[in-house]
């Protein structure tokens, strides 16, 4: 090994090893600079605009009128009282609006795809394109919120669910457009391509609050935070068990607080993303960064995931004081492949309690993909104070590339009561273990007889 390179590695590793304690001051700095939205005093009750919470009447016109009135008054609060409000089509936000669902209120969207046309600019699995409108869509807005104790139902378990088996052509076309740098204005899919819309998408927005609502039955991802910043998501709950029902997907997102959320999802609870392949790498100036996840209850496929669409990079993620309240396949899961490029770095996870999982902690550069030549850089990942009752497959997995190893991984105070496989580490360097127990703890050696 080149001596100067060895010295650099030694200094780099020593620096990380000395500073891998959970950086609470950095967390506080992120949380303190996130701005909550502020709204004018204007309020409008949708009942005054002809809405009926009878589960039958189409209330699309009344909700559109409410948004228009808020825009005319430079913002305000739209009040949705108790009742079931059917809406045949999307809600499109304007700036400075709080959509407040009172206790007992439910918005129930139609499941007719043509209700979500004309197409809007959106993103689908990391590729920008035109597609069906998300059910709730905010584009280039500021100071916006969805609050209250009501429910949003995406009616995703019927027509939208059937799209999953038909999406192959549209999915491959979107990826080809990404890889071939087709201008976004020419990426028009929508009707006939079977790409399901997100339930809620904030796109190029800032100063966002989602608080205390319940999300059910999404067609696709539930809450997509796309190219947005200064975001607070707290106190919400889920029961959304359809295909690809991720709970929260920050993508190219900055300064995000996710706290006190109770998940029950058909896919990842939180999946941090940053664009896919060529398009993501071209946006490397806007990685997903400064994301705090704390005091959450996990249930679904995976607890916290980074990737696999993360080509612009993900950095400065802080996860603490979370636990499972039901099944998870994997607890913490970092995944990428040789298509992606980009980086995953400065990830700190502490005080996590898991029950039974398939894999407890999993870092892989070998997630399935279509190409090669763009290995991701995974470094500076710290896990501390993690407990798990049972891992039916593996306790800890670390998988890098032969020519770009995963590096600087700290595992401290890890207690996995039972695991079929304890630790599997391939193409990794500078892995520090301190107080790591998998299975029964060894005792002092017995004397020879």
Label every PLM stretch briefly.
Residues 1-21:
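Bacterial Sec-dependent N-terminal signal peptides
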Residues 18-449:
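Extracellular/periplasmic carbohydrate-active domains that bind, remodel
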């Amino acid at each position: 090994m080149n001596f100067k390179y060895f010295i650099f590695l030694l200094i780099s590793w020593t620096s990380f090893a000395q500073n891998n304690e959970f950086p609470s001051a950095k967390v506080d700095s992120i949380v303190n600079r996130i701005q909550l939205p502020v709204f004018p005093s204007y309020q409008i009750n949708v009942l005054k605009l002809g809405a009926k919470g009878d589960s039958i009447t189409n209330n699309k016109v009344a909700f559109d009128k409410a948004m228009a009135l808020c825009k005319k008054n430079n913002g305000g609060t739209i009040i949705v009282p108790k009742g079931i409000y059917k809406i045949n089509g999307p809600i499109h936000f304007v700036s400075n609006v709080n959509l407040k669902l009172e206790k007992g209120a439910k918005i129930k969207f139609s499941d007719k795809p043509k209700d979500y046309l004309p197409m809007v600019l959106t993103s689908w699995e990391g590729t920008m394109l035109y597609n069906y409108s998300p059910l709730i869509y905010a584009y280039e807005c500021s100071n916006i919120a969805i609050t209250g104790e009501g429910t949003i139902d995406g009616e995703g378990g019927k027509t939208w669910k059937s799209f999953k088996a038909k999406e192959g052509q549209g999915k491959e076309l979107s990826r080809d457009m990404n890889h071939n740098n087709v201008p976004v204005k020419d990426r028009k899919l929508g009707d006939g391509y079977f790409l399901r819309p997100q339930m809620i998408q904030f796109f190029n927005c800032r100063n966002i609050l989602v608080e205390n609502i319940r999300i059910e039955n999404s067609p696709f991802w539930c809450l997509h935070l796309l190219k947005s910043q200064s975001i607070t998501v707290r106190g919400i709950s889920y029961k959304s068990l359809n295909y690809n029902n991720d709970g929260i997907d920050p993508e190219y997102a900055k300064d995000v607080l996710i706290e006190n959320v109770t998940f029950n999802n058909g896919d990842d609870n939180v999946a941090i993303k940053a664009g896919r392949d060529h398009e993501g790498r071209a946006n490397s100036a806007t990685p997903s960064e400064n994301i705090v996840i704390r005091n959450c209850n996990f249930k679904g496929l995976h607890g916290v995931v980074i990737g696999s669409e993360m080509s612009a990079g993900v950095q400065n993620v802080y996860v603490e004081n979370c636990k499972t309240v039901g099944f998870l396949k994997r607890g913490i899961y970092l995944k990428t492949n040789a298509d992606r490029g980009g980086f995953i770095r400065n990830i700190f996870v502490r005080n996590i309690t898991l029950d039974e999982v398939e894999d407890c902690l999993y870092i892989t550069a070998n997630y399935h993909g279509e190409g090669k030549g763009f290995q991701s850089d995974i470094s500076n990942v710290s896990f501390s104070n993690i407990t798990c009752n049972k891992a039916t497959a593996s306790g800890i997995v670390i998988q890098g590339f032969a020519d770009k190893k995963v590096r600087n991984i700290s595992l401290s105070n890890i207690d996995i009561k039972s695991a079929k496989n304890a630790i599997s580490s391939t193409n990794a360097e500078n892995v520090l273990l301190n107080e790591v127990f998998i299975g029964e703890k060894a005792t002092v050696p017995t004397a020879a007889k």
